[in-house]
Amino acid sequence: MADTTGRIPLWVIGTVAGILVIGLIGIFFYGSYSGLGSSL
């Protein structure tokens, strides 16, 4: 963990990516459940 100055740590990227993926999946399933996903 030496070369972290001026860079974004990998665990931050992984956490943000995981939250975004979970959020997108949640929005997709919510849209499909409420009937909005069929228009996509």
UniProtKB/Swiss-Prot annotation:
Record field: transmembrane: 8-28
Gene3D superfamilies: 6.10.250.2070
Membrane-protein topology: Single-pass membrane protein
GO CC, alphabetical: chloroplast thylakoid membrane; photosystem II reaction center
GO BP annotation list: photosynthesis
Keyword vocabulary terms for this entry: Chloroplast, Membrane, Photosynthesis, Photosystem II, Plastid, Reaction center, Thylakoid, Transmembrane, Transmembrane helix
Subcellular location: Plastid, Chloroplast thylakoid membrane
Principal place of residence: plastid
A Pfam family: PsbJ
Function comment: One of the components of the core complex of photosystem II (PSII). PSII is a light-driven water:plastoquinone oxidoreductase that uses light energy to abstract electrons from H(2)O, generating O(2) and a proton gradient subsequently used for ATP formation. It consists of a core antenna complex that captures photons, and an electron transfer chain that converts photonic excitation into a charge separation.
Record family assignment: Belongs to the PsbJ family.
Protein name stated in the entry: Photosystem II reaction center protein J
Organism: Arabidopsis thaliana
Gene that encodes the chain: psbJ
